[in-house]
A protein has these predicted regions:
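Conserved nucleotidyltransferase catalytic core and NTase-mimicking acidic/glycine-rich helix/loop elements
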Residues: 4-145
């Protein structure tokens, strides 16, 4: 298993753990502790995506600095949805948006021949999440007048 395989499985495991905390009502742990680890894995994949997408040496800085300058604009547009406020509905939406964005970036890196993307594992994770994600309890902020 290469480091990229490990990164994908680590992110999948973290999202599974985060979802379990949300199911148990442990919002603080889900967002603060696990959420930080999820963000770190996401950043690594976004950096790899940038490196795989550019022939020239693109500087991805560190810690996400200047991310708007080096990240693919299509991925950058999806990034805000991966963050939530302190609410369960928003946390679930951000979790799924994180998986969506990570999946796009990781699949594109995998397509360059750098590793095999575990599509079956992603499908199983998505099924697990969809079975446990509650119906929205409040309207989205954008849904209110």
């Amino acid at each position: 298993m290469c480091i990229r395989d490990s990164a994908v499985h680590s992110l999948f495991g973290l999202l599974l753990w985060q979802s379990k905390q949300l199911v148990r009502g442990e919002l603080w742990m889900a967002l603060a502790t696990v959420g930080h680890q999820v963000e770190e894995q996401m950043l690594v994949m976004l950096q790899w995506h940038t490196a795989a997408s550019h022939q020239d040496a693109t500087d991805t800085w560190y810690g996400g600095r200047h991310i708007a300058q080096w990240l693919d604009p299509r991925l950058s547009a999806a990034l805000p949805k991966t963050w939530s406020g302190y609410d369960v509905d928003g946390a679930w939406e951000a979790l799924v948006a994180t998986l969506d964005l990570f999946s796009v970036a990781a699949r594109q890196v995998a397509d360059t021949g750098r590793f095999h993307y575990p599509a079956d594992d992603e499908r199983q994770l998505r099924e697990w999440l969809s079975e446990r994600q509650p119906e929205r309890t409040e309207p989205r902020r954008s849904d209110t007048p």
